């Protein structure tokens, strides 16, 4: 999940889970039975590999009863968007659940890493990066946000997927002078246009320059209706 990094990483918040980073080490043979995520070769197609990683991690979180939601380009795909997936697979979890989520993935044989940024954890599945996000668009992941998630099929696996309005807000809010790649988000907006409460998204970030420019572009391309000015 792309996030605006124009400022330095903020200090760790009070009460944030203290997960120790995992040190990199050479791969060594192990004697235990292989875990399910290693039973098959990773797909050669990058988009399919990202999709398989999302399905695997989603199935692990769902099977362990965690509260979460799929986000990012795989969530756009689940809502009917393009199957051309970008960068990685993203999941939203509450900060308070980070330790338990990390334990579940570690038990399944995945290595969970703590990057310098304090708003996510990272792991790798089928050679693809998977981000576990505590914040979306500078907003904390909340119980209400996760409660709005929809249970949708991601290929053969059903899982909670971020609601279309929350998903578009998370894609648009980070736009700034240093992060303004409208292309992929425009494609997502076209795919999700009928599912999104656009006025809700506008109220969240439409007064800031780059999100406002994106809304103007959506209007000119007839993706959304022009905003009605009060009389």
PLM regions with names:
Residues 2-6, 11-13, 17-231:
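Compositionally biased terminal segments of proteins
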């Amino acid at each position: 999940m792309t996030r605006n990094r124009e400022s330095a990483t903020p200090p760790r918040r009070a009460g944030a889970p203290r997960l120790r980073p995992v040190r990199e080490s050479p791969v060594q043979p192990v004697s235990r039975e292989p875990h399910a995520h290693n039973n098959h070769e990773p797909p050669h197609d990058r988009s399919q590999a990202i999709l398989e990683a999302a399905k695997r991690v989603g199935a692990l979180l769902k099977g362990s009863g965690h509260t979460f939601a799929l986000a990012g380009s795989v969530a756009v795909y689940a809502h009917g968007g393009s199957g051309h997936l970008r960068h990685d697979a993203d999941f939203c979890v509450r900060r308070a659940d980070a330790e338990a989520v990390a334990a579940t993935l570690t038990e399944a044989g995945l290595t969970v890493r703590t990057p310098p940024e304090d708003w996510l954890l990272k792991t790798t599945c089928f050679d693809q990066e998977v981000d576990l996000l505590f914040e979306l668009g500078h907003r904390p992941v909340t119980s209400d946000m996760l409660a709005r998630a929809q249970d949708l099929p991601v290929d053969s696996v059903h899982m909670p997927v971020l609601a279309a309005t929350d998903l578009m807000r998370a894609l648009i809010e980070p736009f700034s002078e240093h992060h303004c790649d409208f292309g992929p988000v425009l494609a997502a907006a076209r795919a999700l246009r009928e599912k999104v409460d656009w006025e809700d998204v506008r109220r969240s970030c439409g007064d800031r320059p780059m999100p406002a420019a994106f809304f103007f572009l959506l209007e000119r391309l007839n993706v959304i209706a022009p905003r009605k000015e009060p009389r």
